[in-house]
Amino acid sequence: MAKNKDDEESYCGGGGYWDMVEDLEEEICFDAQEVIPNLYIGSISAATCTTSLKEHKITHILSISTNPPKIKEFTTLCINIEDESQKDISSYFQQCHGFIENGRKLGGILVHCSAGVSRSASVVISYLMSVFFKPFWYCMQYLRNIRPCIQPNTGFINQLINYEATILKNQNVISTTTTTTTTTTITKKKLISNDCNNDDNSSGGSGGGMES
């Protein structure tokens, strides 16, 4: 049996064995899943797997943590908040959404907290709600299908439910505005069409048109 690393390298035909082991360890530590294109959610361990982050073309890391890892070579944002029901995580939604959107455009982004269960899940759910205009429970279930362990704490859930009301209200405003704009456009087209018909009727039969 191999007694040390050198013996194992000789036994396995070179250093490729240890490269394989390191790659496997890296893959195991990358505790993250892709939610939608270029957006990942995971635990703090995923944020330290530099090789895996680069392989997934991740350029931005959003840490929802009071003790974020020190990460180089990536664009980072840290939201210093504890996983406690009374903490106001919703006040950070807009800032996080902007950072996520920018990260997705420039490459990819990982959103993480400590275990990838409560804080990061709350932020990702809020982002899905704002982008797709979907209710909280829909986005929660969608994310849980991808990462089964997620479970925002009770306080965060209440904040997300309140945020849902804002999202749906904004959707109604956009829908109303779009409907009004469409109606106005159709009305204008009808008026123009009627004007053209009136002009044709008033000049019809004169035979004064130019011919090529």
From Swiss-Prot:
A GO CC annotation given for this chain: microtubule organizing center
Residue numbers annotated as active site: 113
Gene Ontology terms for molecular function: protein serine/threonine phosphatase activity; protein tyrosine phosphatase activity
Entry keyword annotation includes Acyltransferase: no
Catalytic activity: O-phospho-L-tyrosyl-[protein] + H2O = L-tyrosyl-[protein] + phosphate; O-phospho-L-seryl-[protein] + H2O = L-seryl-[protein] + phosphate; O-phospho-L-threonyl-[protein] + H2O = L-threonyl-[protein] + phosphate
Record keywords, A-Z: Hydrolase, Protein phosphatase
Pfam families recorded: DSPc (PF00782)
Root EC class: hydrolase
Physiological role: Has a dual specificity toward Ser/Thr and Tyr-containing proteins.
UniProt-recorded name of the protein: Probable dual specificity protein phosphatase DDB_G0269404
Source organism: Dictyostelium discoideum (Social amoeba)
